[in-house]
Amino acid sequence: MTRTRVQKMIPKTIEYQKMISGQPYKAYDEELTQARCNAKKLMRRFNDTMGDLENVGPAELIKRRAELLAEVFVFDESSAPEIEPPMAFDYGFNVHFGKKFFANYNCTFLDVAIITIGNNVMLGPNVQLCTATHPLDFKARNSGIEFGLPINIQDNVWIGMGVIVLPGVTIGEGSVIGAGAVVTKDIPPNTLAVGSPAKPIRKIENE
């Protein structure tokens, strides 16, 4: 895994530990702010590969993208995620990819909490995985306090175009989420779910 490579990017602060533990934390903590800034630099470099403006060819482009992703995300280097630019993320190092991952363009990873993605997962264009949320109390919200809850996407999941996955959700193995759905609650394994909020409509029978 690339965890050792990105370890140096992870803030060594109490606020970071609060953040990934689902506790209220100060979003404008100095080290968290710097980590987001560093992430945006890497994100810009990755997104600038869109269109192969240097004419390096498909094979070299795939290699360069994998090298950039390895600087910020956690994954098995034998199977780098395939992500079409542009994409967006908060930190990057809180996203853990399984093998054979594919995301189409304009995907967003709001990773203030851990996003765990299994093997053979596919995301359509404009998918948003959002672990971040805010207090309902406006006084707490205005003070800069935020919190997040993890997202877990298990093996062999397909998430369709424009889906939004909200904090704390697990999508079970083999499930399919229809385009435009807003996933607010856990989805059982081998289930087709659609709508806003997403609701299971039938089981998927795998041969």
Swiss-Prot record:
Coiled coil: none
EC number: 2.3.1.-
A Gene Ontology term for the protein's cellular component: cytosol
SUPFAM superfamilies associated with the record: Trimeric LpxA-like enzymes
Keyword Transferase (UniProt): yes
Signal peptide stretch: none
Keywords annotated in UniProt: Acyltransferase, Repeat, Transferase
Gene Ontology MF annotations: acetyltransferase activity; O-acyltransferase activity
UniProt xrefs under InterPro entries: Hexapep, Hexapep_transf_CS, Hexapeptide_acetyltransf, Mac_dom, Trimer_LpxA-like_sf
Key word Phosphoprotein present: no
Root EC class: transferase
Pfam (any one): Mac
PANTHER family: ACETYLTRANSFERASE C18B11.09C-RELATED, SIALIC ACID SYNTHASE-RELATED
Family in the record: Belongs to the transferase hexapeptide repeat family.
Name this polypeptide is given: Putative acetyltransferase C18B11.09c
